[in-house]
Amino acid sequence: MFQKQERIGLVVYLYYNRDARKLSKFGDLYYHSKRSRYLIIYINKNDLDTKLEEMRRLKCVKDIRPSAFDDIDRQFVGNLHRDETNNHQKG
């Protein structure tokens, strides 16, 4: 049966757009902004450390930023109510 794998998005900034094809071997290339010269690549969380190390060694990569999606609170129902009660308790 199909197993869902944990994945993480990486924003990879490039020096030149022509080097985008070199990074497609590391994961699924989701978006390429030619104007701002960055890519969004999704890779498996298991391979994160090794692939980051390999990508940072490339001369075409300027910067790599992992996605903060896991750190964001995604419980939207009742968010305003929770914020109001926290502010009243502090003040």
Swiss-Prot record:
CC terms in the record's Gene Ontology section: cytoplasm
Keyword Cytoplasm: yes
Superkingdom to which the source organism belongs: Bacteria
Primary site of residence: cytoplasm
Keyword Cytoplasm: yes
Database matches in InterPro entries: DUF2129 (IPR016979)
Keywords on record: Cytoplasm
Compartments where located: Cytoplasm
A Pfam cross-reference name: DUF2129
Family according to the record: Belongs to the UPF0298 family.
Protein name per Swiss-Prot or TrEMBL: UPF0298 protein SPy_0397/M5005_Spy0329
